[in-house]
């Protein structure tokens, strides 16, 4: 029987990491000899006893560059498994895991988290992506639209496993919204170009300057765009309306206390935060970006959609929601009826079935 290696060089605290914990905690009782390779310090992450951790030995290692982490984890993969039969479940840095799998003669299952739009327009990038990913033994994607795009642009077959979500009931409130009775907005995601939070800030600036609406935005996440977003907030006198809150462990507690959830990404896979907002019964406005939001919101049936970057339309949708909350609230109530799509046990069992196809050979 092959060793099972979970490959994730950088654990940064987001949707990918949440799926990592769900998957590892579920499969640890289903298989023996499970290893997790990462270049991150794992003191704060709750993995089960059956998961054997492989990390850099240097206690001082604290490099934040994902490329460097991927190189180090590739070295650890070769060092520890070059003479063993193994199966790699790659949740990140798939180029590295596929390449190394050929060196050590291992099987490899890769999970794609975000749609590969950036490779489509460049011929060489597209060729490289298609060639390398065709070497994977199996490709897992997290939405049906993702599967269609992968086949359409790269002629690659894949298996859809929707994100598993644990729905918990919480009444916890956050101090930022305490005693504030007007429009409470929340957005969650890494502060990166992909998440495109500047669109939301521009929309809210437009809202502030053109309508007499009192609002507050709680923006959860960390990343390299922090300074850029903070400058925009201060330059437009939005500091009383918007708080950059950094990373928060239990994001669902914050969603629950808001009136409106907004996602502004340029591209996604299947964003957990939208599903968590649905579970909390909070109305949603999201970009119609490739590939997951449209599927989660069922083409606008379960929430409002707008084109990426269109902050004017976003402003209008927020204003419309403020003036008439009933329509979007009806969509959020309806959304709860479709949460079965993200069933925790059913979707995680799909990982077990997929792994079993390769683990014994």
What are these regions (language model features)?
Residues 6-65, 147-151, 223-225:
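N-terminal strand-loop element at the rim of the active site
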Residues 298-311, 320-325:
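Conserved acidic donor-binding segment of nucleotide-sugar-dependent glycosyltransferases
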Residues 70, 89-96, 112-113:
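Short His-centered aromatic/hydrophobic patch
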Residues 145, 164:
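Carbohydrate-associated surface elements
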Residues 230-246:
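Nucleotide-activated donor-binding/catalytic signature segment of Leloir-type glycosyltransferases, i.e.
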Residues 14-22, 183, 190-209, 224-230, ...:
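A conserved mid-protein helix/loop that constitutes part of the nucleotide-sugar donor-binding site
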Residues 247, 266:
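Aromatic "clamp/platform" in nucleotide-sugar-dependent glycosyltransferases that forms part
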Residues 283-287:
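Short hydrophobic beta-strand element within catalytic cores of glycosyltransferases
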């Amino acid at each position: 029987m092959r060793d099972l290696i979970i490959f994730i060089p950088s654990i940064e605290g987001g949707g990918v990491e949440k799926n990592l914990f769900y998957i590892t905690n579920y499969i640890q009782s289903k298989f023996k000899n499970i290893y997790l390779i990462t270049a991150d310090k794992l003191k704060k992450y709750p993995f089960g006893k059956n998961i054997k951790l492989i990390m850099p030995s240097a206690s001082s290692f604290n490099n934040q560059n994902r490329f460097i982490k991927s190189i180090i984890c590739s070295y650890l993969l070769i060092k520890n498994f070059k003479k063993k039969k193994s199966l790699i479940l790659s949740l990140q840095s798939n180029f590295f895991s596929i390449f190394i799998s050929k060196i050590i003669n291992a099987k490899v299952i890769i999970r794609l988290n975000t749609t590969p739009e950036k490779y489509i327009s460049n011929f060489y990038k597209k060729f490289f992506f298609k060639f390398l990913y065709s070497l994977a033994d199996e490709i897992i994607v997290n939405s049906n639209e993702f599967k269609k795009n992968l086949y359409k642009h790269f002629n690659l077959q894949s298996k859809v496993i929707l994100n598993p979500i644990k729905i918990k009931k919480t009444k916890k409130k956050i101090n930022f919204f305490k005693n504030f009775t007007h429009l409470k907005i929340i957005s969650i995601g890494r502060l990166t170009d992909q998440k495109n939070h500047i669109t939301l800030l521009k929309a809210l600036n437009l809202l502030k300057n053109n309508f007499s609406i009192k609002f507050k935005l709680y923006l959860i996440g960390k990343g390299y765009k922090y300074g850029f977003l903070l400058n925009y907030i201060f330059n437009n006198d939005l500091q009383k309306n918007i708080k950059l809150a950094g990373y928060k462990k239990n994001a669902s507690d914050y969603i629950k206390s808001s009136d409106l959830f907004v996602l502004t990404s340029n591209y996604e896979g299947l964003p957990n935060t939208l599903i968590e907002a649905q579970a909390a019964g909070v109305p949603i406005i999201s970009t119609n970006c490739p590939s997951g939001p449209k599927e989660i919101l069922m083409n606008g049936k379960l929430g409002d959609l707008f084109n990426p970057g269109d902050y004017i339309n976003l402003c209008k949708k927020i204003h419309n929601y403020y003036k008439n909350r009933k329509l979007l609230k009806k969509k959020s109530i309806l959304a709860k009826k479709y949460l079965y799509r993200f069933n925790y046990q059913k979707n995680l069992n799909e990982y077990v079935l997929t792994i079993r196809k390769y683990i014994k050979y």
